Amino acid sequence: MLTLLNTFAELPEAYKAFAPTVDVLPLIPLFFFLLVFVWQAAVGFK
């Protein structure tokens, strides 16, 4: 079962060059979430 999931988790050969970018993509929404707090701190949590 784990090998089946691992097979689906691997990028196709044509996209192997983008693997580092794909690893970072899930973190982008977290940066926006943190940006909200920084922005609100800058304007005083109004």
Curated annotation (Swiss-Prot):
Organism: Prochlorococcus marinus (strain MIT 9515)
Localization (cell): Cellular thylakoid membrane
Transmembrane segments: 25-45
Keywords from the UniProt entry: Membrane, Photosynthesis, Photosystem II, Reaction center, Thylakoid, Transmembrane, Transmembrane helix
GO biological process, one term: photosynthesis
One Pfam family recorded for the sequence: PsbK
Name of the protein in its database record: Photosystem II reaction center protein K
Protein topology in the membrane: Single-pass membrane protein
Residue ranges listed under propeptide: 1-9
Matches recorded under NCBIfam families: PRK02553.1
